[in-house]
Each structure stands twice: as C-alpha cells, then as structure tokens.
Design a protein with these regions (language model features):
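Position-specific recognition of the canonical hydrophobic site in helix A of tetratricopeptide repeat
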Residues: 77, 104, 111, 138, ...
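Canonical tetratricopeptide repeat
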Residues: 71, 105, 139, 173, ...
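Alpha-helical segment of the N-proximal tetratricopeptide repeat
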Residues: 62-101, 105-112, 142, 146
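Short coil turns that delineate tetratricopeptide repeat
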Residues: 63, 97, 131, 165, ...
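Helix-start (N-cap) detector for alpha-helical repeat units in TPR-like alpha-solenoids
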Residues: 65-66, 100-101, 134-135, 168-169, ...
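Terminal, low-structured helical/coil segments at or just beyond the last alpha-helical repeat
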Residues: 51-57, 260-313
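Structural signature of tandem alpha-helical TPR/SEL1-like repeats
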Residues: 79-87, 112-125, 147-159, 180-193, ...
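TPR/TPR-like (Sel1-like) alpha-helical repeat modules
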Residues: 226-235, 239-270, 295
Length: 313
C-alpha cells in the first residue's frame, strides 16, 4: 500500500548481512557483473548500454506538431488570451517557419499585446510566404491605423482590395483611414461601399452619419443614425443622434437618448474617447452643448465617475 503522508519508511533487518549499505554494495557489484556479461554477449562494451537514445523527430512530424500548436494559439486568441497565444504561435513558427498561417496568428497576438513592431515583422514574413493573401495586406493596414499612419494604410488596403474586392471590413477600414486624412467625401464613399456589400454593417452606417454631419448634411445624418438604431441599440449612434436632435430643438428625445446612451457606455461622456472613435469637431461640439443641459447633470457626473476609457498606446 502507498505510504501515507508524513510517514517515513523504516528499514528493518535482523542481522548484519541484511545491512542496507551492504545490500547496496552487493547489488552494485551484481549489476556491474551482469552488464559485463551482457556486453560480452552482444559484442559491445558495457558502457554503451548506459548511453541514452535521443529520438529526433522528422520534418514531417515537426510540421504535424506545429499545426496542433498553431490551432491552440488561434483558439487562445479567440478566448482573449493574447500573451499565451503569442508564446504558442512563436513555437509554431519555430517548428514550421514556412507556413504563413502561423506567422499571421503570431502577428495578431502581438498586435493585441500592443507589440506593433514585432507584429509588423511577423506580417512581413507572412507576406513573403504568401503575397497573394489579401488578409495579410489588410492586417498590415490595421497596424498602420493603430499607429495613426493612415497614409501607409491606404495603399495597403487598396492592394488587399485588388485581391479581395468584396471585403466589407476592408472598405470600413479604408473609410476610417480617409477620415484620419480629412478626406471626408472619400471616407463616405468607402463606408457606403461597405454597407452595399453588407447591409447590416451598422458600424459603417454609423460612420456614414458621422461624416455627413461634418459635411453639414445634418438631416441625412439624423436619418442614417435612426437606421443604425434599428439595427443595433448602441451607445455611440444613440448619443450622436441625441446631439444632432438637440441642435434642432428636439429636447425631450435628445435628453432621453443621451441618458440611455451614457448608461450603456459611460466612456462616451469623454471628448477624448469621442475623438478616438473618429467623431469630428462639429458632432463633438454639439455633444458638449447637449451634455451641458441641467437635466443631464447627474447623469453626466455618474458617467464621468464610471468611465474606464484610457487612450490607446
């Protein structure tokens, strides 16, 4: 039976021949003799029997292992465990450095860890291996946008769209890049292409309204924000619509929408968060006027206390 916890086994013997030290010496001599006999029997020195055998996996076996590791890394990314995913993806590319999928997973993990330089290097390697994969161009553009380099992002997205012209998300990113370049008509065009490909793409429809508002087309912006809220009751279009309605004197609905929006996402009370979401100057100013209404004082103070947003690095 197994030893119980905290018990120390005792050696028992009745006479000197059973001394454990003597037994060990005799056992060692017996073992040495046996090895000598085996060595002579098999025609090799006994010492060879003590050399460990190291198994070296084949290239195919390493590739097979990398697939399982890469798949696990991708699953960890889906679960939001970017650091663990990066470690596994790095192992996968060491085992199989010629598969662009593992480099892509590694780049995504590095991007989520805000390691933009390493993510760019990993994507560059992936593109060397498979330059005709549109997703790699889009991913590199996403890194450029994160680094606030829209001039670099635009040609990368354009190249990706040559390979995958029906990618709604790519047109959305292109629209965001155009906003950052202050090319508002081009931004609107890109967002409209995104919703043409994917009509329920409410984020692109919301950004259409943001651009229209900055272009002075307030009525059309309001109409599109109402369409957005039929698709998704999100705090961003809700507060933007409230600000636009407040400018038109529709006080009751504006106050109600603003109250609901800030309860859903208090971060939108912060002008810097609005700016990071690519809100233009006009809609931010309209929102500031709305949030200055006495009826919203308590709601605004609560949102400011509950806001958790921090500027992306």
């Amino acid at each position: 039976m197994p030893l119980q916890q905290n018990q120390i086994p005792h050696l028992r013997f009745n006479h000197s021949n059973n001394d454990p030290v003597l037994r060990r010496i005799r056992f060692s001599r017996t073992l040495a003799a046996a090895l000598m006999v085996l060595g002579g029997w098999f025609g090799a020195p006994a010492a060879n029997a003590l050399i460990p055998y190291v198994y070296l996996p084949t290239e195919e076996e390493l590739k097979g292992s990398s697939i399982g590791i890469g798949r696990t890394a991708a699953q960890l990314l889906q679960l939001g465990q970017a650091k663990d995913a990066a470690r596994l993806a790095a192992l996968a590319v060491r085992l199989n450095p010629n598969d662009e999928r593992f480099w892509s997973i590694l780049a995504e993990a590095q991007l989520r860890n805000n390691d933009l330089k390493d993510a760019s290097r990993s994507l560059a390697r992936a593109k060397e291996l498979n330059p005709e994969k549109a997703g790699l161009w889009f991913a590199e553009a996403a890194i450029a946008l994160r680094a606030e380099r829209p001039n670099d992002a635009v040609p990368l997205i354009a190249r990706g769209l040559q390979l995958d012209p029906k990618n709604a998300a790519a047109y959305f990113d292109l629209g965001n890049a155009r906003i950052m370049q202050n090319e508002l008509p081009l931004a609107l065009e890109s967002f409209e292409k995104a919703t043409a490909l994917k009509p329920a793409f409410w984020e692109a429809l919301n950004n259409q309204a943001l651009v229209l508002y900055e272009l002075g087309q307030h009525q059309e912006a309001v109409r599109r924000w109402r369409r957005v809220l039929k698709l998704e009751a999100n705090a961003e279009p809700m507060l933007a619509l409230a600000a636009a309605l407040h400018q038109r004197g529709e006080q009751t609905e504006a106050i109600q929408l603003a109250s609901t929006a800030l309860a859903k996402n208090p971060n939108y009370v912060l002008p810097l968060h609005q700016a990071e979401q690519l809100w233009g100057r006009r809609i931010r100013e309209a929102t500031a006027q709305l949030l200055g209404e006495p009826e919203l004082t308590n709601i605004v103070e609560r949102a400011q206390a509950n806001a958790t947003w921090k500027k992306s690095q």
